[in-house]
Amino acid sequence: MSDATKKVALITGGNKGIGLETARQLGALGITVLVGARDLKRGEAAAAELKREGIDARALKLDVVDDGDRKAAAEAIGREFGRLDILVNNAGIATEDMSANSTLTTSEETLRKIFETNFFAVVALTGSMLPLLRKSAAGRIVNLSSILGSLTLHATPGSPIYGAKMFAYDASKTALNAYTIHLAHALKDTKIKVNSAHPGWVKTELGGAGAPMEIVDGAKTSVRLATLADDGPTGGYFHMGDTLPW
């Protein structure tokens, strides 16, 4: 069993981009970070990079859409640590072109593929990890959403996203926000806090090189929500210090 005084965080999709930077920033706070990665070798490379920076990092084979991986990850964390303090549901995919409204052209296959990773896998993995999170003195769940999941902003002419419509991706993040609200309510009598984070438009594989934000800033909202004090919010939707409309 590892040091019982150190917090333990699992970051899905933690081997690159915002996930890796989230692991880096949490690790810099003295938190043990578990780098969840679909490809174990890439996860190990990311963990090795963090270790060179003095961070207690471990790689964990975790394809979020694989039920066997989800169960094995929960069992491994339980054996090694006996609990989980922080779950950052960071892994996500997008396959649509933001330059055109895809509502009339998105295939059922695309809808199912995106929802499988961005919504169903999050629900399933969180369910697998909840028994471990309940053993934490202050469990925190962060669902990496997007401003593109805001129905209010999508429906408001002149909003920052009114002209940006990626139907499957946007809908998957709206569904994820609904899960955040419902899970926070279900856990309202516990010490676990659940929130949705919008990282911003960040220079990643998903965001593209033309995005205005650097990765170091894109991780800040997730890190803040992962380390909330006992009097912090739950069931919210945030970017940096701002609350976003559902």
Ranges and model annotations:
Residues 53-56, 76-89, 95, 107:
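A glycine-rich helix->loop->beta "capping" turn
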Residues 2-34:
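Canonical Rossmann dinucleotide-binding motif of NAD(H)/NADP(H)-dependent dehydrogenases/reductases
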Residues 69-72, 113, 121-128:
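Conserved mid-core alpha-helix of short-chain dehydrogenase/reductase
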Residues 11-12, 89-90, 140-146, 193-198:
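Structural signature of the Rossmann-like NAD(P)-dependent dehydrogenase/reductase core
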